[in-house]
Amino acid sequence: MIRAYMRFPGGVSKTLTLSYDDGVEQDIRLVEILDKHGIKCTFNINGGVFAPEGTVYEQGKVHRRMTKKQCYELYAESGHEVAVHAYSHPHLECLPASMVAMEIFEDRKCLEETFGRVIRGMAYPYGTYNDTVVEVLKNSGVAYARTTVSTEKFSIPTDWLRLPATCHHNNKRLMELAEKFVGMEVSANPQMFYLWGHTYEFEANDNWNVIEEFCEYIGGKDDIWYATNIEIYDYVQAYNRLEWAADASRVHNPSAMSVWVKAGKHHSKSQIIEIKPGETAKLF
């Protein structure tokens, strides 16, 4: 029997991604931590509620949104992703479809104008949504939308518009899950660790050590691909577009990026193969 499994860039079997919401000042410290350990994050921003330029927050206020200028300076050339979080951070499931569409389009337009790129990712405000919201997203250029559901698992998503996470950073099992992920020997389907939260929570709970220890432990591993949400989404879609011969002896890559496959007639004889853009590769 022929077996073939997706592998991430370089042929690795695991990927890590983070997702943090609201565009708050504490994101600055998180970016410093992530960059130190080579970890990528998606930052979900509400384009309609940037802090006004010159804002001075009262002492003790924890949820401090950044100005548009601050957000640009932090994220624009950082290598991290910027994604939609709805224009005004509403409960989308409470709105009629027309207003949901407006919230998404206005946020996309604002962020695309600010950062000069196409914005296709999203996290649901408050983590709430319904089927109507999902249908609107399908027609609004949104590729994926993160929920607040935590599975404590590492499966690759199948429903990208109802995207769950592995866990929130306050999960008591965070380091246990990290150790399990790092120690995994993956022979079949690839694995993804997805962490989410809000950086102001680190200040509110006085627990920056949680994310510092996590990143120090899980960063810098040769067998983990550190990627943003959209990078993982795009890669999985490219893999799914591979065109296989009837007997799976050849495979054609019609996409614009290289794709890696672990393929073999038996697990013990599997090989990692890079299929370059436009290439038809012979596997056996």
Model-predicted regions and their roles:
Residues 35-143, 150-167, 190-199:
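Metal-dependent polysaccharide deacetylase catalytic core of the NodB/CE4 family, i.e.
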Residues 24, 168-184:
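A Trp-anchored, charged/polar loop motif used as the substrate-binding/catalytic surface
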Residues 1-8, 112, 144-153, 179, ...:
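C-terminal domain-boundary segment and adjacent tail
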Residues 97-102, 172-175, 205-208:
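Non-membrane alpha-helical structural segments and their capping/turn regions in soluble enzymes
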Residues 20-23, 86, 199, 229:
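Active-site metal-binding loops of divalent metal-dependent hydrolases
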Residues 5, 29-33, 132-136, 210-214:
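A short acidic, amphipathic alpha-helical/loop segment
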Residues 1-26:
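Boundary/entry segment of secreted carbohydrate-active catalytic domains
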Residues 17-18, 81, 224:
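Hydrophobic "anchor" residues on beta-strands that sit immediately upstream
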